[in-house]
Structures are given as C-alpha cells and as structure tokens.
C-alpha cells in the first residue's frame, strides 16, 4: 500500500483514519465506495494483514464526523476540495502571524513553513496548483477556481496589512459574519481618497504647526499614528449613518489635541490660546484647571440632514482610568433616552499599547462589559500601538506578540492593522463599527504605528531606541505615503498634496492670530445640568410628611400573595410594618428605604450597585426578594405606584476600580438621578483610590465637572481585624478642600434619610462620602423617630447631647463621630457631668454650629476628641485645628485633647481580645470616673 501513498499526494498521514474507514467499507461491500477507490483497493494484496496492522485499533474515528465526511461518492476531487477548505480555516486562525503589520519593518515575521500554512501541510503540492477546486460557501467571492488563485486570495486577505484574531469567538454567526466582511473587498472612490488625504493633511499640519510655533512644549503628538485620527473620524461618520445620536470618547493624552480639534470640533484658536497664555478656562471661574492634553470638550457634528453629539471626556495621566467612566456616562445617556437596544449612544475608547496590556483596570472594565448592570451595547476600542511604552520596548511590557490579549476574556474580535496602510485601517474600522452596531459587543482595532518623537516633545528617544529612531527619522509620513499612492494611481497630481498643506497652513496662521485675543469659554452647566448651581445655597428641607412615610413604608412591606419569601424575611417585614404603623422608632434600613421610596415617587431615578448591594453585605437591605419556590424576583421599591421613577439595584462584579469609575461616570451624565456605589467593606475602597484621587475629589476644580455620586463605605472598629474595620476616613479628609465633597459619619437613621435626599433636593451637586454602619444597623439605640424625618426637618450636621444635663455642672465635653458614640453612651454613668456631641458631617466642618454648642458648655474644664481609629488615622489630624478654632470662636481658652488608639501602621489588631482591651481603655480614658465599672 505504501507505493500507492508515495504516488498520491492527497494521501498523507492526517487522512489515515479516513482511508482506513473507506477500506473497511470496501471489504464489507466493494460497491459501497466510489469506483476510483474500488480500483485502488483492488490492487492491494494481503487485505486482512494490512487491516490488522492499521492504527485504527489505537485511534478511533469520530462516527459523527465520519458520517458527515465520508459518503459513498467521495472522490479524489472531494478530498482535494476538503484540503482546500482546511487551508482556508488554517489561514483564518493563524495567518495573522504572517501579516505585514509593522510600518517600521522591525518585526521578524514567521514563515508559512513554521506556521504550517504551506500547501504541503495540507497534503497538496505545487503540481496541483493549476487544478480546479470547489469551495462554495466557504470563501467569499471564490467558488470554482484554481488552487493557485485561492492561495493568492488567502495571502491578499490574511497576510497583507490586516491580521485578525477571531478564533476566541464562540458564536458561529458572529465569526462567519466577520470572515465574510474581511474577505469582501472594499473600494474607495476617488473623491473618498482625496478626502482621506485631506484628513491626513489636517492632522499632520496641526502637529507640525504646534511644533514650530511652540518648540519643546508638551503636546504628546500623534505623528506616526496619524491614521488613528482619520479612523476615528471615519468611525463617527459611519455611526451617523447607522442612526447613532451621540458618541462619548475616552482616551489618554497622546493625540488628544488633534482629537479635540479635528474630531470633536473644538476651535483651533481655543487650543492655540492655551499655548499662548496658558489659560484653558475663563479667569473668573477661579479654578485650578489642568494641562491642555487632559481636557475634554463637547460639540455637535452636523452633516446634511444628520447630527451627532460628540463628547471627549476629561481625564488625568492615569492611563486607562477613563475607560469605565466613559462606559458609565454612555449607560446613563442610554437610560435617559430609554435606549434599550443601546444603539443611539455609543462609546469609543483609544488606548496605548503598553497601557492596554499593563493596567489592571482594563481587565476589570472589559469583564464588566457583558454584565447586565454595566452593558452599553459594546465599545469600539482603538489600540494605538506605537511599539513603545515611554522608554520601554514592547518586549519589556508584555510577553505576547500583541498588546490586546486582555480583549480575549470577553471573546472580542481583534483586528490588527498596519497604520501606514490607511485604506486597510479604514476597512478594519468599517468592520468594527458595523460589528458593534449589529452584535452589541466590544470590538478591538489595533493600529500598529510609531511615535515620531520621544514620549513627549522634550524627550530624547535616541538614548534608548536608536535603531528604531534612525528608521523613523528618514521615514515619510503616513500622509506622504498615501499621497504618493494617489499620484501613482492618477487620482491627484504631483502638486495636490503640497497645495493642501499650504492651504491648511494659511488657516492655522489665521487661527493663531485670533488666538492672541481669544477668550476661553467654560461650556459649563449646560444640557442635563441646567438648573444645577455651582455654589451651595440655603440648606434644603428634606423632611417628608409622616403619614406619607408611613404609607410608603407599609407599601414596601406588602408582598404579592403568590410570591413566597424566606420565613425570616416574613418576620422582618411584619416587624417593620408594625414599627411604622404604631409610630415606633425606625432603624437604618427602614430610613434608607423611605428616602429612596419618596424620591422615586417624586420622579427621581435611583441606581445603586456594589458587591452584594442587592441584599446588603450585612443582610439589612433586601432590595430584591427571591421566591423560595422558583427563580422569580420582586423589587418592592419598583412597585410603589404606576407613575414612579425607576429603582435599579445590582450586585457588581468583584472589582472596585472599574465599578466605582462606572458609577462616577453615570453620575456625570445624570445629575437629576441619585447614583450610589457601596463597598462590601469600606476597607476595600482603596482598590479604587485613583477614582477618588483623580476624579471624585478634584474633577470640579480641574475640569468643572461636578458629580452627585454617593459612596457608602461600611466603617467601624468591631474586632474584625485590619481588613474589615477601616474605610480610611483620614484619606478622604486629606482630600477635602474648596468644599469639593461631603464627608459624613452619621449615627442615626434620620441622618442618612436626610443626607440621601439632600443629594437631590439641593441645587448643587457634590460627592457624598458616607462612613456607613455595620453593627449599628441593628443597634437598639441607633434608631430615629419618624418625627425626625417629618415635615420641615433637615439634616443636622452636629448633634447635641440627647439627655437632660444641667449645663452649669458640665465638667467635660466629648466630641466624636460614628459608632464610638454608642460605646461612650452605653458606658457613661447615669447623672454624669459629661456631654457627648456628635459630628455627623466632618467636612465641610460647621465651625459656627460647633462653636455655638461649645459656648453652651463653656464652664467645662476638659474638651476631648474621641475616636476608635489609631491616632495617625481617623479624623484627628484633620479636625484638631478646626475644633480649636471653634473653641476660639466660642471664646473658650482651652484646647482639645486626643483620646483614642495609639499610632499604628495597621488600622486594627487581628485579635478580638486585644481589640476589646483597646476599646475599654479608650472609653475609660474618655469618661474617666464617669464610666460604668
């Protein structure tokens, strides 16, 4: 049999099982196989001996595959076609390694032999290249052709300037659609080609203009990656054609100035003015501002009868931090438009290669993308791969060939494209835009390009990448390359490109002259922010008629008769209902629910997410009830009335950074909604520290971007160790300045009721940081009367002593915040001469209110600040100066003394016994002889 194999190229080892199965059929019934095979097998001697030696004893064919592939009429031609189809599949999987992706030509590409993409790997040889094959329905535009023609077409599609990775996609429909689009040739009309060249000219000339006028000034040029701006422009135009009404863009600093002008539509003179006088906001706003390449902008793009609103988000230099923020903004806009198909508003994110594979928030954000609570219908990602991360080479920043491996965790299609081939870039963009709109999923286009200068224009790249930059120095620009192509094809003449550049240079010169006297505009408090104030007004009345609260609370306790809830919850709702109807004091969870309920009935949408937020980490909220019989759910807060607003509550994925960023972004686009993020424990909030530092605390003074986001951080020292005790209150207080946010540590249900409602009823929007309770959720003293939530009531930032004590007999005044109050209260003896005052709001510090209370007790000899946290943590370092200033205002010649835990590197001890001893010690020191022994 061997001699026949040697003579027949289509019989190779990979077909052993196939041939053996045919041979078995032949032995059983010679007429069951094709005549060609009958003749072949008839020449074989010693049939039984050959069969006994076959590998079929070891390797058994899949009967389903065998049945599908081996029909009675399979011939040489059929096998030949099968091999061709296998080659197509292999090209689709692996030919991206052969693609010409590097415009600098530095990459050493693999060969067909290495990748087993040569025809011999499929049991074919050069003698068969002119033979006809039939691959109907397998390869677009090719049905009956020669094998050589198929190889040529495969090489053109898969090994030219685009390399694709679609194998991670499980959905067959999506995968086939992508291959069809890729294998379909697209052409550009002459006018389109000239328009593309004009885009190149505007991108290139603006960068060169700034380089000449402001030498050495940082601008993070996009030169070398010019095609990314052209591609983004194309993506927007394509989106307009698909009915998209708004696009939110997020990106880092490289190429931002060109994106602001060329893409979003900011006047060139506005950007140039920032270079001339350094001002990027009107002086009268009196804000700190930010550098030019961090700023955002919004404008409408109008074309014929179409209009689309474009927004470029402000962001810091913390790469990729903007990703989930943009997603949150898009989701909020979609929700406001009731865009359930998520097709009217979309996001475009631009990433750097080193950042995309290096920053963990990328994986967090991508993982969120398909989840119901965070789905925005897919994001279009452009990865601008300039093959460097500051001074680090690609090999220093990742182990993989591509920077886009993270995208595979959500099975996103990835198209890699050579940035010097603009028509290939635009084809990839066209596929990506249509895919996102059709399948509502993320898609990635990686543009491999280069960076003309160093990390910034003052940096010298020759120190570290001399070989690369020697190539770049002599390299024509992408625009120049394309212009030469158009000249060769006769679309433009030799002078066309130069004339375009000269014409645009004249425009920029005019913009430069106008920039000298240009007055910056703020574009502040427009759109959905109309009616919101920048400054605090009179304190909002946040109370609600008691009867209304009782009715709402009772309604929340009504469960449908055919809905079976857990018996423990039955009891909980019975107790809660009885508490409300009999006018007894309510707990924290009830107060929160009542605050939500009245806001919803007043037309305010509410969104709350976080790890375990549906039930609540401490099993107190139970926003979503689960039927014990089946998997159905019931949300009481969405069943108050037919005209109420929407309550959305969701458990987040196990991430802080991206999730908090998403909710912050959501709050930026929905100032009339109450948006909350809750940490599982406050200790874990520092996983999102960048969002707190770069956005929540500082966005108003840097970018004039306000947020009303509420952050709930469970915080208290209860013997649970260093990872479940502290939300790092001190860090938030360190960030507090210019009345940038509210920082609170409330102790009563009434306080949280008013705080939540204040976020909406005030005319201003500021983030609210809440050190929320754990054990106080069920503490017998941590309750409030409904009258404290009633009409004409409001949030009280400082709570006076609750017991009747003769102020003339007071010897000591203790100020504190949070849970420690109840520890002090429980340990203080009856008829004590010590008063305990609570600061429900730590920032802004209400000095006048505190001073008025201190003056009331001006005969006291000792003034103490008591806290549970170590001395170097908690509020002490922030509040000591403020408290002493309040004493001065009260005309009391004294100072506050610290009582609390000693300084510590760790927030809390791991031993419950040690914790209890520490707690007892600080209580004894605070109360002295007035402590219950």
Curated annotation (Swiss-Prot):
<comment type="function">
    <text>E1 component of the 2-oxoglutarate dehydrogenase (OGDH) complex which catalyzes the decarboxylation of 2-oxoglutarate, the first step in the conversion of 2-oxoglutarate to succinyl-CoA and CO(2).</text>
</comment>
<dbReference type="Pfam" id="PF16870">
    <property type="entry name" value="OxoGdeHyase_C"/>
</dbReference>
<protein>
    <recommendedName>
        <fullName>2-oxoglutarate dehydrogenase E1 component</fullName>
        <ecNumber>1.2.4.2</ecNumber>
    </recommendedName>
</protein>
<keyword id="KW-0786">Thiamine pyrophosphate</keyword>
<comment type="subunit">
    <text>Homodimer. Part of the 2-oxoglutarate dehydrogenase (OGDH) complex composed of E1 (2-oxoglutarate dehydrogenase), E2 (dihydrolipoamide succinyltransferase) and E3 (dihydrolipoamide dehydrogenase); the complex contains multiple copies of the three enzymatic components (E1, E2 and E3).</text>
</comment>
<dbReference type="GO" id="GO:0006099">
    <property type="term" value="P:tricarboxylic acid cycle"/>
</dbReference>
<dbReference type="InterPro" id="IPR001017">
    <property type="entry name" value="DH_E1"/>
</dbReference>
<dbReference type="InterPro" id="IPR032106">
    <property type="entry name" value="2-oxogl_dehyd_N"/>
</dbReference>
<dbReference type="Pfam" id="PF00676">
    <property type="entry name" value="E1_dh"/>
</dbReference>
<dbReference type="InterPro" id="IPR011603">
    <property type="entry name" value="2oxoglutarate_DH_E1"/>
</dbReference>
<dbReference type="InterPro" id="IPR031717">
    <property type="entry name" value="ODO-1/KGD_C"/>
</dbReference>
<dbReference type="GO" id="GO:0005829">
    <property type="term" value="C:cytosol"/>
</dbReference>
<dbReference type="Pfam" id="PF16078">
    <property type="entry name" value="2-oxogl_dehyd_N"/>
</dbReference>
<keyword id="KW-0324">Glycolysis</keyword>
<dbReference type="Pfam" id="PF02779">
    <property type="entry name" value="Transket_pyr"/>
</dbReference>
<dbReference type="InterPro" id="IPR029061">
    <property type="entry name" value="THDP-binding"/>
</dbReference>
<dbReference type="InterPro" id="IPR042179">
    <property type="entry name" value="KGD_C_sf"/>
</dbReference>
<keyword id="KW-0560">Oxidoreductase</keyword>
<dbReference type="GO" id="GO:0004591">
    <property type="term" value="F:oxoglutarate dehydrogenase (succinyl-transferring) activity"/>
</dbReference>
<dbReference type="InterPro" id="IPR005475">
    <property type="entry name" value="Transketolase-like_Pyr-bd"/>
</dbReference>
<comment type="similarity">
    <text>Belongs to the alpha-ketoglutarate dehydrogenase family.</text>
</comment>
<dbReference type="GO" id="GO:0045252">
    <property type="term" value="C:oxoglutarate dehydrogenase complex"/>
</dbReference>
<dbReference type="GO" id="GO:0030976">
    <property type="term" value="F:thiamine pyrophosphate binding"/>
</dbReference>
<dbReference type="GO" id="GO:0006096">
    <property type="term" value="P:glycolytic process"/>
</dbReference>
């Amino acid at each position: 049999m061997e001699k026949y194999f040697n003579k027949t190229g289509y019989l190779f080892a990979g077909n052993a099982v196939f041939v053996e199965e045919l041979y078995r059929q032949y032995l059983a019934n010679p007429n069951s196989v094709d005549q060609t095979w009958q003749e072949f097998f008839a020449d074989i001697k010693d049939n039984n001996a050959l069969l006994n030696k076959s590998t079929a004893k070891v390797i058994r064919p899949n009967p389903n595959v065998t049945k599908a592939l081996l029909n009675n009429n399979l011939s040489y031609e059929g096998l030949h076609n099968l091999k061709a189809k296998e080659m197509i599949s292999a090209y689709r999987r692996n030919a991206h390694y052969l693609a010409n992706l590097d415009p600098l030509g530095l990459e050493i590409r693999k060969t067909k032999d290495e990748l087993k993409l040569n025809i011999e790997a499929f049991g074919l040889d050069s003698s068969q290249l002119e033979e006809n094959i039939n691959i109907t329905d397998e390869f677009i535009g090719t049905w009956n052709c020669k094998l050589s023609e198929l190889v040529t077409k495969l090489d053109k599609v898969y090994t030219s300037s685009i390399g694709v990775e679609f194998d991670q996609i499980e959905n067959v429909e999506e995968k086939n659609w992508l291959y069809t689009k890729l294998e379909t040739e697209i052409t550009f009309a002459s006018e389109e080609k000239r328009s593309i060249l004009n885009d190149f000219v505007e991108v290139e000339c603006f960068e060169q203009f700034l380089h000449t006028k402001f030498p050495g000034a940082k601008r993070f040029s996009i030169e070398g990656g010019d095609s990314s701006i052209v591609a983004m422009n194309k993506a927007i135009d394509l989106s307009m054609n698909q009915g998209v009404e708004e696009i939110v863009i997020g990106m880092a600093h490289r190429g931002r100035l060109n994106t602001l002008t060329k893409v979003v539509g900011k006047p060139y003179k506005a950007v140039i003015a920032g270079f001339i006088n350094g001002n990027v906001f009107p002086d009268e706003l009196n804000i700190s501002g930010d550098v030019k390449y961090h700023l955002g902008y919004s404008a409408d793009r109008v074309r014929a009868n179409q209009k689309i609103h474009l927004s470029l988000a402000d962001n810091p230099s913390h790469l990729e931090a903007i990703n989930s923020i943009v997603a949150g903004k898009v989701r909020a806009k979609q929700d406001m438009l009731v865009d359930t198909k998520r097709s009217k508003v979309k996001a475009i994110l631009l990433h750097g290669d080193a950042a995309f594979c290096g920053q963990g928030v990328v994986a967090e954000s991508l993982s969120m993308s398909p989840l119901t609570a965070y789905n925005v219908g897919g994001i279009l990602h452009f990865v601008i791969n300039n093959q460097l991360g500051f001074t680090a080479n690609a090999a220093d920043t990742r182990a993989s060939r591509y920077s886009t491996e993270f995208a595979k965790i959500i099975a996103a299609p990835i198209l890699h494209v050579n940035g010097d081939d603009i028509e290939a870039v635009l084809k990839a963009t066209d596929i990506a835009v249509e895919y996102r709109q059709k399948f509502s999923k993320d898609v990635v286009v990686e543009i491999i390009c280069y960076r003309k200068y160093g990390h910034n224009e003052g940096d010298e790249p020759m120190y570290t990448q001399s070989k690369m930059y020697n190539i770049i120095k002599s390299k024509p620009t992408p625009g120049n390359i394309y212009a030469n192509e158009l000249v060769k094809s006769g679309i433009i003449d030799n002078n066309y490109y130069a004339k375009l550049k000269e014409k645009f240079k004249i425009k920029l010169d005019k913009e430069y002259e106008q920039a000298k006297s240009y007055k910056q505009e703020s574009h502040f408090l427009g759109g959905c922010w109309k009616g919101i104030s920048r400054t605090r007004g009179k304190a909002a009345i946040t109370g609600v008629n008691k009867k209304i609260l009782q009715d709402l609370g009772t309604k929340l306790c009504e469960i449908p008769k055919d809905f079976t809830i857990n018996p423990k919850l039955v009891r909980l709702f019975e107790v809660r209902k009885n508490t409300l109807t009999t006018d007894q004091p309510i707990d924290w969870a009830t107060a929160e629910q009542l605050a939500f309920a009245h806001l919803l009935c007043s037309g305010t949408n509410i969104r709350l997410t976080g790890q375990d937020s549906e039930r609540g980490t401490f099993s107190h909220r139970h926003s979503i009830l689960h039927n014990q019989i089946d998997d159905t759910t019931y949300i009481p807060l969405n069943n108050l009335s037919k005209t109420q607003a929407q309550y959305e509550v969701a458990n987040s994925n196990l991430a802080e950074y991206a999730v908090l960023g998403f909710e912050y972004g959501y709050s930026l686009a929905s100032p009339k909604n109450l948006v909350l993020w809750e940490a599982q424990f406050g200790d874990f909030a520092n996983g999102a520290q960048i969002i707190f530092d770069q956005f929540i605390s500082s966005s108003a003074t840097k970018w004039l971007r306000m947020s009303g986001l509420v952050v709930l951080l469970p915080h208290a020292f209860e013997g649970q160790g260093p990872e479940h005790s502290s939300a790092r209150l001190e860090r938030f207080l360190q960030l507090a300045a210019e009345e940038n946010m509210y920082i609170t540590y409330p102790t009563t249900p009434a306080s949280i009721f008013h705080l939540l409602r204040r976020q909406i009823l005030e005319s201003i929007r500021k983030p609210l940081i809440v050190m929320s309770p754990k054990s106080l959720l069920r503490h017998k003293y941590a309750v409030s009367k409904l009258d404290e939530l009633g009409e004409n009531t409001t949030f009280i930032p400082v709570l006076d002593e609750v017991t009747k004590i003769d102020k003339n007999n007071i010897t000591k005044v203790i100020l504190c915040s949070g849970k420690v109050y109840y520890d002090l209260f429980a340990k203080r003896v009856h008829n004590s001469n010590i008063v305990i005052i609570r600061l429900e709001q730590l920032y802004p510090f209400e000095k006048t209110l505190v001073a008025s209370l201190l003056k009331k007790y001006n005969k006291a000899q000792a003034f103490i600040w008591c806290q549970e946290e170590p001395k170097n943590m908690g509020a002490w370092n922030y509040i000591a100066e403020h408290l002493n200033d309040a004493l001065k205002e009260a005309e009391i010649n004294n100072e506050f003394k610290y009582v609390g835990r000693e300084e510590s590197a760790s927030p809390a001890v791991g031993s419950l016994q040690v914790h209890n001893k520490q707690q007892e010690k600080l209580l004894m020191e605070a109360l002295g002889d007035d402590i219950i022994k």
